[in-house]
Amino acid sequence: MKLVVINGTPRKFGRTRVVAKYIADQFEGELYDLAIEELPLYNGEESQRDLEAVKKLKTLVKAADGVVLCTPEYHNAMSGALKNSLDYLSSSEFIHKPVALLAVAGGGKGGINALNSMHASLAGVYANAIPKQVVLDGLHVQDGELGEDAKPLIHDVVKELKAYMSVYKEVKKQLGVE
């Protein structure tokens, strides 16, 4: 089964990127890295569909059996970079596809608001966010390294995502939409 991990931070050395890379490496996922990809600000113009970064994003998500969205929390919401990437996607990429949500919060404040903003945006594209979600604080990622205490939290959410990926594979089979 194909797993796609979207790093929602525009920072090349951000904590969220450390987490996203860990997930992609540990679980043989494909990383779409918003710190590297040159995804322009979404404007709704038809011409944006032909951009390579947009085609790559849409193709990866559509081909995935499951998606992990990782974001920092900026001003009580997901990053603008992640929201921008979601604006390029639609229900045709997310149909019958489970999505795991993970937020990396800094400064000891929350992360839950980033998750809530992801839920709201995902509802608009009929994405199926799984019940389990993770908030990691700044203590979980320090000096570019993922702390050992964060790894079980990540493994648990990916384990649940993979279970949902199996279920949705069967659902698609029964619906004849594979």
Swiss-Prot record:
UniProt lists the family membership as follows: Belongs to the azoreductase type 2 family.
Task: Spell out the protein name for this chain.
Answer: NADPH azoreductase
UniProt-listed Enzyme Commission number(s)? 1.7.1.6
Function, as annotated, reads: Catalyzes the reductive cleavage of azo bond in aromatic azo compounds to the corresponding amines. Requires NADPH as an electron donor for its activity. Compounds with paired naphthalene groups coupled with the azo group are good substrates, with the following preference order: Rocceline > Sumifix Black B > Solar Orange.
Origin organism is Bacillus sp. (strain OY1-2)
Pfam families given in the database record: FMN_red
Name the Gene Ontology molecular function terms of this record: azobenzene reductase activity; FMN binding
Swiss-Prot/TrEMBL induction comment: Constitutively expressed.
Record keyword Oxidoreductase present: yes
